[in-house]
UniProtKB/Swiss-Prot annotation:
SUPFAM superfamilies: Anticodon-binding domain of a subclass of class I aminoacyl-tRNA synthetases (SSF47323), Nucleotidylyl transferase (SSF52374), ValRS/IleRS/LeuRS editing domain (SSF50677). It catalyses: tRNA(Leu) + L-leucine + ATP = L-leucyl-tRNA(Leu) + AMP + diphosphate. This is Leucine--tRNA ligase. Its EC number is 6.1.1.4.
Amino acid sequence: MKYDFKNVERFCQDKWDFSVSKSSKQEKCYVLEMFPYPSGKIHMGHLRNYAIGDVIARYKRARGFEVLHPIGWDAFGLPAENAARDNNISPEIWTKENIDNMRAQLKSIGLSYNWNRELSTCEPNYYTHEQKFFLDFLKHGLAYRKESWVNWDPVDQTVLANEQVVDGKGWRSGAVVEKRKLSQWFLKITDFAEDLLKCLQSLKNWPEKVKTMQERWIGKSEGATIEFEVVGLNKKLKVFTTYPHTLFGASFCAVAAEHPIVQDLKNGSSVVIPVLDTGIQEIKSKRENDEKIGVYTGLNVKHPFLDKELPLYIANFVLMEYGEGAIFGCPAHDQRDFEFAQKYNLPIIPVISSAHLGVIPARDQNSYNGSQCQATQMTKEAYTGDGVMFNSEFLNGLMVSEAKEVIIKKLKEKGIGKKTTNYRLHDWGVSRQRYWGCPIPIIYCKDCGTVPVPEKDLPVILPADVEFTSGGNPLDKHPTWKFVDCPKCGKQAERETDTFDTFFESSWYFAAFCSEDKSIDKDACNRFMPVDYYIGGIEHAILHLLYSRFFCRALTKCGYFDIKEPFSTLITQGMVCHATYKDENGKWLFLAEAKELIARGTKVQVGKVEKMSKSKKNTVDPNFIIEKYGADTARLFVLSDTPPEKDMEWSDDGVEGCSRYVNKLWRMVMQLKPVNMHYDNKSVTGGLLEYRKKIHKLLHGLTDDLENCRLNCVVAKFREMTNLIAEIDVAAGKSLIDEGICILIRVIEPFMPHLAESLWQEIGGQPWPKADESLLVDDTVTIAVQINGKLRATIEVAINLPQEELKKIAIDSVSSKIDQNKVRTVYAVPNKIVNIVI
């Protein structure tokens, strides 16, 4: 007798229909996995991600919650546009075909989605709402346009947000990012920087690692803004610093290559222009973490307190995106400044005492240039610790913390500085020079300027008749779509041809799911949000999760709903990993290829276990596993051995083991039919009572595990329960077996829904089982019996047994090992231990 998983799964999937109502009086539970990009094919990471969410959703339904568990498609993006260029196919057609394929694959897994709420971000009925959001953001001062230096990806030919630049390269293309000055639309995420930072502490069910990553990205810094007078120019150079107390140790100032003062110099007639041009190109080619390099501008700035001038450099480690795009350099107490001073032979002036420098009060006694410092105690690094100030006039003798406050006060009194809070976070540039994205609803008129598209004219829909024969944005070259009458004056004007960053769509989709028509229904959003369980990869910790938190605040400000935080519990599932293989020439091999070579006696290099990836050929196709073993086996395996947040290693043997368990459970229930739903085992005694206690303890434990998303522990417990039930004698304990089976089938349902549904038809249904509390309390305890401090036996006795009785039972248990006449004394600790001294 074998379980026919194919017919069972097909039957269940055709029958299932999961709906949700905003008017239900039941407590809500919103479960959401990060929606996928429609690449056309699911991978094992998808399977694990969605299986985790489905277990939670099915469990919560069983506990009586009104569960919202939707699915959709993050459908805009560059891959569709590239596919259009490569295959001469419309991005829309390519995307919709992929969605159809992936929808069928997801349904084959048996996921309990509210399919009637399915959405796709490339549909006009979805992005019309975000165009309206943008217009409202404009009204509320949360969106603006300006010319600014942007990150330009030369391969994808589009702008990238700061968050999309990883180690100086484009997050998608891997190309070295360039700096360009373009007019861009921005969203004012900085308006919420402090709130985004503070509210991280309220996210009790988020991984600490994610909160730390966001905290560092927001990057709050307390310091001062200082104005330096530029010698020979009627200009002030503003510098933000978190170390204002080291100002007396300053030996240079430096600006970013994109700083306005650099452009002023290039527009002038200075003799240093040729040198500047060459130096700036070299600086731009070097990333922040590379060797510290710079070029002297030919300008100096006046020290705010001393009668001296500081040379002004352009340096690669100064970022326009941070602070004012300018620094003062104190090499003695900043490592980057120290390396720069060594390279360019600049003075190194300590102003904070330390153990390796000592306190030297006279300024000239401890001032070195970069080459001289090689022969001093300061040979390797700057001193960045605490200490007492010296070489600093009115700061001498003060501790660092006090010196900061004093110098900020002095700067303010002189009108050349103030206390400042700075954030690493910058406003989000949302303009992208791509076709396959949501059009930005703006019109440019020569007479009226920048004109928002009237709400009645939304959505602005992408034209279908575009050409992808050349690079760049096809919307720029469109002969008709680009041109439109101005809504104000009626004259011919031009549309904005940039589209929104695709993170715009994914920053609010969770709110769209709350209503069936994909609109933002305030009552529905307030009913279902925040998302109770949000499941996805930790790679989204900064980009998507931070933008989503911003969007909730922005939409709340605009009156759409009253939710500040989008996600209550965040589960960042680990990756699915597999061993890697190479041939003798170092070429990556699929597992099947490796096995074939090994069978022929050819040497194969077995590499380390790594995340499944197409490039390393260590992938396993979920469709193959589902076709061969069934969806329940695939689901069970990806949930079995590893906590959801940890990486899991793929194992063919593990899949086989899960398949055997599925078939074993099905056969066991079939052999024990009929199952009596009306069992009564409250009066069982002896061995049957012990079995019943164990079953209910497992039920209690796995329910607690489910509440805390310890899904691998749940699997271990219901497999143990299966073995317990199989041990019970049918003749003596059929009623207890019936009880065990009813409990077991109910608790496996979130993990193996098709199998559970099949068995349900045999035994009927029931709500989530509740453990009998009276069976969870032990009435006996195991006691260790020692002889002269060494363990010799264990005994099972009643809890709180009187000491004298406990001693007697303990002595009897080791009577064969001692001469009772030689017992000197017996120490007994109730419920714990007995020690017999002889």
